Amino acid sequence: MPDVTVVGGGLAGSEAAWQAARAGCRVELWEMRPVKETPAHHTDLFAELVCSNSLGNRSPETASGLLKEELRRLGSVILRCADANAVPAGGALGVAREDFARAVTETVGSHPNIEVVRREARDIPEGPAVIATGPLTSDALHRKIEELSGETLYFFDAASPILHRDSIDDSVVYRASRYGRGEADYLNCPMDEETYYAFVEELASAELSPIKKFEEDMYFEGCLPVETIARRGPDTLRFGPMKPVGLPDPRTGREPFAVVQLRQDDAEGRLYNIVGFQTRLRWGEQKRVFRMIPGLQRAEFARFGVMHRNTYLPSNRMLEATMKIRNALSERPLFFAGQLTGVEGYVESTAMGYIAGTNAARVARGLEPIRWPEGTMMGALARYITTKEGTLQPINSNWGLVPAPPKRENGRRLGRQERRRRQAEMALGVLERFAGEVLRPPVAAGR
């Protein structure tokens, strides 16, 4: 019998299994694919990225970048594989989608303390367990979780289309990263005013894949379908995912009226995704409307954009900040991780997997689970989703979660950039002390 069972081989489950195994526990990692498929996955690999191939900003002076740096310093297997399979993406950490997932699968699956079991979990396992089945939890397990929680919440999420590189017109697109930061890693499709408004009109009126009427507004605000943004007003897109600022066309020296950006999706550069163009348009409509974009008139689609329902828990009424279920609901040593807990984002899901896996291993060894300090981005996220008043909405890492730095000695506030830099320094300092004093040196050193 394993010391810890982890259900779900996504980002959070893979991280949880790895951390429990690092702590010396025998781990069974259950993944139902390919025995039972989901509406959004295309492979049976662990940590398959079903939406964007970007893990967010690299800089530790951004909230997303700080979270990644915390995980790196703690020895995250997901960040190790992401860094090893990075593709050009300007200031973001973009990864070669399949190479990254394959690396996680091989790394996690080859750990001597981890046994991979390909099966559907129809009930909650006995003993210390981490449920990290994500937003596409199977119906049978979903019912068992609802018996514990009394309810689950949900929203809709969508993925952007992926194009074949050789079908993109190089005489129209140009390479650039916004404000010239880093390498010129993005392909940019420039639009003039007339083309832009014609495109927005067609996009806003295009035929959608059906969902129930009452579900039409149940989207995560940070990942809205591009057609939903278009319906909010004719200029909304060019101040959002199609904003041209910092992207002058080298042929004219001027910024276009609007820009559609394409980001490399694989290591070889054969595939590019349309940045910020998650959609629930019917596939035929995606071809028709997106081929109106300059440079994409003959674009061939490797994958169309798709939409799926994301389930998450009322963690503020159900979980402790350790990711353990509250004793009032169950005295079982049961932990939850990933998007199922109400965080939004690949790295945020990974962070909750790290916490849950570490604490499941502690309980298996007869120790109490531990809370991450709130001065870290990891701890602040865990605290927010487990203490939020009212209805919990999915949340990304953001600076509002961690303590602000003190003002200058003269009482004046710090500038924005200096404030973020100091917040990051404070958080990483707290993390280093926590890792050395509480997690113990073997974990802190990344062994």
UniProtKB/Swiss-Prot annotation:
Reaction(s) catalysed by this chain's protein: uridine(54) in tRNA + (6R)-5,10-methylene-5,6,7,8-tetrahydrofolate + NADH + H(+) = 5-methyluridine(54) in tRNA + (6S)-5,6,7,8-tetrahydrofolate + NAD(+); uridine(54) in tRNA + (6R)-5,10-methylene-5,6,7,8-tetrahydrofolate + NADPH + H(+) = 5-methyluridine(54) in tRNA + (6S)-5,6,7,8-tetrahydrofolate + NADP(+)
Region (Disordered): 398-421
Biological processes annotated in GO: tRNA methylation; tRNA wobble uridine modification
Compositionally biased tracts (Basic and acidic residues): 406-417
Keywords: Cytoplasm, FAD, Flavoprotein, Methyltransferase, NAD, NADP, Transferase, tRNA processing
Record-level Gene Ontology MF annotations: flavin adenine dinucleotide binding; tRNA (uracil(54)-C5)-methyltransferase activity, 5,10-methylenetetrahydrofolate-dependent
EC number: 2.1.1.74
Annotated compartments: Cytoplasm
Keyword NADP: yes
Main subcellular localisation: cytoplasm
Residues where FAD binds: G8, G9, G10, L11, A12, G13
Name of one Pfam family that matches: GIDA
Cofactor(s) essential for the protein: FAD
Enzyme class at the top of the EC tree: transferase
UniProt xrefs under HAMAP family: TrmFO (MF_01037)
Role summary: Catalyzes the folate-dependent formation of 5-methyl-uridine at position 54 (M-5-U54) in all tRNAs.
Similarity section: Belongs to the MnmG family. TrmFO subfamily.
Protein name: Methylenetetrahydrofolate--tRNA-(uracil-5-)-methyltransferase TrmFO
